[in-house]
């Protein structure tokens, strides 16, 4: 099941329309327009669906609509949260309404029910036979993975506080330990393509509470810990390990990566970006990455872009779906993808409409 549209608003900011999502996606925009907020919002919605803690829940209000494609079915799930209560909730399948809820009543398949005010209906009506679509949404949420690329810190050793995942919190050691020799070799070969001259990756158990990942680099005598690597190398290698780990697990429903490429040089940003986007397309993993990195923008086709602009509390997504002429006309300018973003082309085009 794939997320095809994401709509969201809260007390201090709102998407003016739903963001359409494809198999792979790049969120771009200037600083402080809302790229990280969009990724964090999807993460928070996954948490709420799973009844996990939502540490960044807005104090007063948020509302979201998630639209999925499941083979031939279109599933649209909407809910609104206000003052610790669910004030709206609806579920439609191919345009047919199965669930409606407001502050006065809740109808599920035409029957009146009374879910607790602070619970989604799918929390209290789980049944794989009677309500299979609830289970599909929950399974989707269980398989949302993510990573804050810019917060991967070599000083954290095996800790992975940078990960955005409601239920999957495996650390670096656990991921490497679970991989076969072939998978480890895949990571080494991918690292070498990025000009990181790794020769070996292995785990080391000193005592029960001290478990390490050890790296061997060409022409370096001593073994290296993750904390011995440069910040850029640490970020790239951590992403490669997660990428391989995900490839041997049940594939994730959605992989969120915030600030992709931050801290890497031109050559490695380009190579890692191509590697990641190609990997996700080939493995059928939906990817949503954010970046304002010049180099990364130039290697990701504009059809996969969502450009965010902000006017006060309103965040405006621009994409080939809602502005086809903007994107199609740009192909004839001869400019680079980054010029599309950084020049006044967009503002001139939108003002002329």
Q: Can you say where each PLM-predicted feature lies in the sequence?
A:
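Walker B motif beta-strand of ABC-family P-loop ATPases
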Residues: 254-256
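Walker B catalytic acidic pair
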Residues: 258-260
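Phosphate-coordinating catalytic segments in nucleotide- and nucleic-acid-processing enzymes
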Residues: 48-238, 242-246, 337-347, 351-353
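C-terminal lobe/lid and adjacent interdomain/linker elements of RecA-like ASCE P-loop ATPase modules
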Residues: 270-353
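Conserved SF1/SF2 helicase motif Ia
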Residues: 251
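Helix N-cap at the start of a conserved alpha-helix in ABC-type nucleotide-binding domains
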Residues: 266-267
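Pre-Walker A-like glycine/lysine-rich segment at the N-terminus of P-loop NTPase domains
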Residues: 1-47, 54-61
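Residues immediately C-terminal
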Residues: 44, 262-263, 295-296
């Amino acid at each position: 099941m794939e997320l095809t549209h994401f709509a969201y608003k809260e007390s201090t900011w709102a998407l003016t329309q739903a963001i359409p999502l494809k198999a792979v996606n790049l969120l771009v925009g200037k600083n402080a327009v809302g790229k990280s907020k969009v990724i964090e919002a999807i993460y928070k919605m996954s948490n709420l669906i799973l009844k996990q803690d939502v540490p960044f829940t807005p104090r007063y209000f948020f509302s979201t609509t998630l639209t999925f494609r499941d083979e031939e079915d279109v599933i649209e799930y909407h809910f609104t949260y206000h003052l610790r209560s669910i004030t709206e909730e609806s579920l439609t399948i191919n345009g047919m309404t199965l669930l409606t809820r407001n502050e006065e009543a809740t109808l599920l398949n035409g029957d009146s029910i009374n879910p607790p005010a602070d619970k989604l209906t799918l929390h209290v009506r789980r049944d794989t036979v009677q309500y299979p679509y609830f289970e599909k949404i929950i399974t989707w949420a269980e398989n949302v993975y993510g990573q804050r690329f810019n917060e991967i810190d070599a000083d954290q050793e095996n800790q992975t506080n940078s990960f955005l995942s409601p239920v999957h919190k495996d650390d670096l050691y656990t991921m490497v330990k679970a991989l076969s020799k072939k998978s480890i070799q895949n990571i080494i070969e991918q690292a070498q393509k990025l000009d990181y001259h790794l020769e070996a990756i292995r785990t080391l158990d000193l005592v029960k509470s001290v478990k390490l990942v050890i790296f061997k680099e060409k022409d370096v005598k001593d073994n290296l810990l993750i904390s011995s690597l440069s910040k850029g190398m640490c970020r790239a290698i951590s992403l490669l390990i997660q990428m391989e780990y995900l490839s041997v697990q049940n594939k994730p429903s959605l992989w969120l990566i915030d600030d992709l490429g931050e801290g890497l040089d031109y050559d490695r940003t380009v190579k890692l970006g191509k590697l990641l986007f190609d990997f996700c397309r080939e493995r059928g993993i939906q990817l949503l990455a954010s970046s304002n990195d010049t180099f990364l923008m130039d290697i990701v086709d504009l059809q996969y872009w969502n450009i965010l602009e902000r006017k006060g509390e309103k965040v405006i997504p621009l994409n080939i779906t809602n502005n086809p002429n903007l994107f199609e006309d740009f192909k004839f300018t001869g400019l680079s993808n980054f010029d599309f973003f950084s020049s006044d082309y967009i503002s001139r085009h939108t003002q002329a409409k």
